[in-house]
Amino acid sequence: MPRQFPKLNMSDLDEHVRLLAEKVFAKVLREEDSKDVMSLFTVPEDCPIGQKEAKERELQKELAEQKSVETAKRKKSFKMIRSQSLSLQMPTQQDWKGPPTASPAMSPATPLVPGATSKPGPAPYAMPEYQRVTISGDYCAGITVEDYEQAAKSLAKALMIREKYARLAYHRFPRTTAQYLAHQGESVPLEEGLPDFHPPPLPQEDPYCLDDAPPNLGYLVRMHGGVLFVYDNQTMLERQEPHSLPYPDLETYIVDMSHILALITDGPTKTYCHRRLNFLESKFSLHEMLNEMSEFKELKSNPHRDFYNVRKVDTHIHAAACMNQKHLLRFIKHTYQTEPDRTVAEKLGRKITLRQVFDSLHMDPYDLTVDSLDVHAGRQTFHRFDKFNSKYNPVGASELRDLYLKTENYLGGEYFARMVKEVARELEDSKYQYSEPRLSIYGRSPKEWSSLARWFIQHKVYSPNMRWIIQVPRIYDIFRSKKLLPNFGKMLENIFLPLFKATINPQDHRELHLFLKYVTGFDSVDDESKHSDHMFSDKSPSPDLWTSEQNPPYSYYLYYMYANIMVLNNLRRERGLSTFLFRPHCGEAGSITHLVSAFLTADNISHGLLLKKSPVLQYLYYLAQIPIAMSPLSNNSLFLEYSKNPLREFLHKGLHVSLSTDDPMQFHYTKEALMEEYAIAAQVWKLSTCDLCEIARNSVLQSGLSHQEKQKFLGQNYYKEGPEGNDIRKTNVAQIRMAFRYETLCNELSFLSDAMKSEEITALTK
């Protein structure tokens, strides 16, 4: 059966939910006092009066519930369900004996569904012995039964919405979470959660071979409402009958987004999530206290493997700043010494040599220092993104940026390619470090893609230690004001139409087809703190009608990027080609609503600092195990002091975090920027070896490395969740840690499944 996008109407949206969602947007748009806006999403921890009032309300609810006969029955039912769940979550060594036949998602705690057996199956892995922390009788986390039911069902619905969007775009969704959300024991196909990345060429293969492009299909592509539709032929185009692919529906997306917006402001849900997150952090502290030495003993007995020789991926780095400042300075001096009379630019028909470029700037490269180069971010860039962007201009000269850090210039981006290749060689020499640099496509012209592919092939930039991500800066307003684009739809068309053409007719676009093998995802980048006066809704103008010079809001960009990536991925999957992940910058600054948009559309995000401000979203990101690439050193110079960065807190709670460098040229001092990031985090937060190796393992899982590479670096079963998916001989992550993470996630998910099961039992008794 063909995959289709399930549609909803605005009439399906509850009036209360719609009003709450509009209230959130209205508050954010008006830019009211930030504390007032944040109070919508947070729990009043720092306000004694607010805390007291909240406790009073909870106490009144508890007293009212005690007098209710109906509530007493439900409490009894919950206690029974909870005791069953706990009995499944406390495996004994005897329970776990047997051949490794059980499904990974059914261990150690099988979701309770009607008709399911209460006896757990045999262990699919050798269960590690360690001291577990269990709380009995904890059936609703210290809140009323009514609030617990409401919160759990709402969270489950939000996760189902996330799962729908993830599966349609071939993004990842954790199989364990899916199993708990499934009805009547539905199985979740294992391959569903695996994106298709092109495996690296074999040593004897040419990575630039253009002869393996599949045959052309001759399909036609047209844009409707900002989304590209595929048609088998001219007749189908005239009939408006598109090729059988899932095409997104804006009204459905707005309904789903409204549900999440209403959920993150719901009082009982905020309280429930806040308490569960506090519990997760405290539980990890207890786990560390009880099992730290056992974990360390596991690692010490693991031969040949330590933190230095486990694979690490820099999951968020911009290609234009992938070298450190000393590297850039050395390269500038080297080019000036070896080829000063080379023609490097042309201005008004006059050819300009490298010596003349520096003469016009009144400087001698010999006298340059890292200080005079002035590309490093410092105290003056804090909360000043405009000043930070200027740091991309060496010595403040845009001429040097165009010459050394661009792919399109008189030299065809040769200098930039040479520097990137030097960085790649350093990664290859280190053997265990990988990188995912971002290259820019702006959407000014459809020729940008062919130019970038030509740069990649002509300068032979491929490296086995690099995978490429395309970043799309959110700067439509600049292009529109300069009359470079007629509307936002044209920008989307320039970004995505060449990709559809290369997918449909690869024989006609061989260079781009080859380049796309090494591209694994898309990013959306710019200053998130920029304010937008527009509220994205079903009444927003479609991209072809967005002709104003005002920049569309963040959520508008994300929806239309996701929509086109989703259609493209389904078309490429149909052709047996690699697919792409959507990995936007999100939650670094700006509005909490950015994180709502990313929850629906993104496979993973970069930064995620604002999750700290919303317990509901933070808990949802935990339950859905959405990967977050965090860059504490970058944040320290731009938005958040290092000591206040939530990375350590997120790691302890069990969120899927990795460390990344963002911009080594601006933020780092050493040749190995990623190791510098790990070293500082380890020192400041006193992270253990197991913590560091867990973060490194997360980075490989989050990355666009192929299935074959991940099997080689993490183990044959890396895609299975829990200890069964961990090979300590390759990852150096203790099985005790993996078992703790998995059992804790299962416990949290069981709260949601218990609430759904209770509803089914209540319906049956009635």
Swiss-Prot record:
Chain segments carrying region Disordered: 89-114
Gene3D superfamilies, alphabetized: 4.10.800.20, Metal-dependent hydrolases (3.20.20.140)
One BP annotation, GO: erythrocyte homeostasis
UniProt key word Amino-acid biosynthesis: no
Swiss-Prot/TrEMBL catalytic activity: AMP + H2O + H(+) = IMP + NH4(+)
Residues holding Zn(2+): H316, H318, H585, D662
Function statement: AMP deaminase plays a critical role in energy metabolism.
NCBIfam families, per the entry: AMP_deaminase (TIGR01429)
Protein name: AMP deaminase 3
UniProt source species: Mus musculus (Mouse)
GN (gene name): Ampd3
